């Protein structure tokens, strides 16, 4: 179990950095200045992490709370699910655990 703790704690910052970068680049793609997009993406991730840390709710309950019926957020969430965000994250953890087992 210790290798898994090492992977989740040690590798996840890079995964989160990649997510923040992807959010910021999407903002730039749609016309936002890079520095502004990065600041918004970073603050959004910080606020979301704080909400999870301080809440007794499961992350999916928090997702449901911010998705308005027929709104922009649910549309984006459905796109992330269809594009395999969860699978990509799970595969990254699997690959890191596998690599750790060979070290």
Whereabouts are the PLM-identified features?
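Anionic-ligand binding region
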Residues: 1-38
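NAD(P)-dependent Rossmann-like dehydrogenase/reductase catalytic/cofactor-binding core
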Residues: 38-103
């Amino acid at each position: 179990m210790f290798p898994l703790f090492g992977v989740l704690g040690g590798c996840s910052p890079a995964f989160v950095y990649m997510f923040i970068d992807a959010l910021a680049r999407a903002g730039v793609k749609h016309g936002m200045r890079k520095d502004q997009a990065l600041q918004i993406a970073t603050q959004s991730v910080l606020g979301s992490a704080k909400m999870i840390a301080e809440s007794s709710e499961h992350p999916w309950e928090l997702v449901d709370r911010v998705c308005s019926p027929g709104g922009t957020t649910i549309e984006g969430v459905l796109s992330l699910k269809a594009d395999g965000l969860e699978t990509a994250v799970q595969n990254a953890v699997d690959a890191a655990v596998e690599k750790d087992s060979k070290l």
